[in-house]
Amino acid sequence: YTVAQKALHWIVAIMIIAQVVLHEGMVDAWRTFERTADVSGLSSPVVLLHVWGGLLVLVFAMWRLALRRNRGVPPVPADEPALLKFIAMATHVVLYGLMILLPASGAAAYFGGIEAAGEAHELMKPVLIVLIGLHVAGALYQHFWLKTDVLKRMTHG
């Protein structure tokens, strides 16, 4: 991976963790707004960090996809079982999709008041968390059990 690809990977990872942490504050403000029509909570620092942080995740995800298209990525280990190759590919495709769909649906809910977008946003969150867990578990499995360089390629290798 290029330096830019590695940097964007870790920046987006940190930003997504922050999004998960800030999520409950966003939900609380939104529910208060729905109950009372009081918009003041929708401009709180926690809400604004969640909204604008999400949009940055979207921008960085698009940048990552452009780098991936233009620079490519290292090949998977040649002796990797076909099932693991498929799981890795599918996980990456869905993770990239969620890095686009979650911010887009959140923006549609926040800026456009589209309730269905907010509901979709909520439904995608646990899927993202599970896939992040799978992604991390896969990297650790590659590193400690299969003894490949997959993890090192995204850190210092």
Where are these regions (language model features)?
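Membrane-embedded alpha-helical bundles that constitute the cytochrome b-like, heme-associated redox core
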Residues: 1-157
